UniProtKB/Swiss-Prot annotation:
It comes from Prochlorococcus marinus (strain MIT 9215). This is Large ribosomal subunit protein bL12. Keywords: Ribonucleoprotein, Ribosomal protein. InterPro entries: Ribosomal_bL12, Ribosomal_bL12_C, Ribosomal_bL12_C/ClpS-like, Ribosomal_bL12_oligo, Ribosomal_bL12_oligo_N_sf. The keyword Nucleotide-binding does not apply.
Length: 131
C-alpha cells in the first residue's frame, strides 16, 4: 500500500461507530452510491452462478432486513444496547428506533448476519422478523 492509503486506513481505525456511520452516509451522498446495494451485488453473485433453476426460490433470497417488531418493556435497555451495537447509531437515534417498533433495524444484510442479529435481539428481549 502507498503511504497515503496507509494513513487513511489508520485514520479510519480510530473512528468511533457513530463517526464511521456518518462517514458512510457522507460517502454515499458524495458519490451517489449505497453501501447496502454494493454488498447485495457481491452477495448475489454466488447464488446467480449456482443453479439449474430447480432450487431457485431458496437461493434467490440473499439479502435480509432485520425488523424489530416489539420488545419486552422490562428489557428495553438490553434491546437498545444490541440495536446500538448493530447499527452504530447514537443513543438518541437508537432509542427512537427501538421505541418506534415495528421498525427495520438493518437492511440488506447476509442471511447469517441477519440470523445472528435476530438471535441477539431476541436474547435481549425483543421480537424480530426477517424479511
Amino acid at each position: 500500500m502507498s503511504a497515503k492509503t496507509e494513513e487513511i486506513l489508520e485514520s479510519l481505525k480510530s473512528l468511533s461507530l457513530l463517526e464511521a456511520s456518518e462517514l458512510v452516509k457522507q460517502i454515499e451522498e458524495a458519490f451517489g452510491v449505497s453501501a447496502a446495494a454494493s454488498a447485495g451485488v457481491v452477495m448475489a453473485a454466488p447464488g446467480a452462478a449456482g443453479g439449474d433453476g430447480d432450487d431457485g426460490a431458496a437461493e434467490e433470497k440473499t439479502e435480509f432486513d432485520v425488523v424489530l417488531e416489539s420488545f419486552d418493556a422490562a428489557a428495553k435497555i438490553k434491546v437498545l444496547k444490541v440495536v446500538r451495537n448493530a447499527t452504530g447509531l447514537g443513543l438518541g437515534d437508537a432509542k427512537t428506533l427501538v421505541e418506534s417498533a415495528p421498525k427495520t433495524v438493518k437492511e440488506g444484510i447476509a442471511k447469517a448476519d441477519a440470523e445472528s442479529l435476530k438471535k441477539e435481539i431476541e436474547e435481549a428481549g425483543g421480537k424480530v422478523t426477517l424479511k
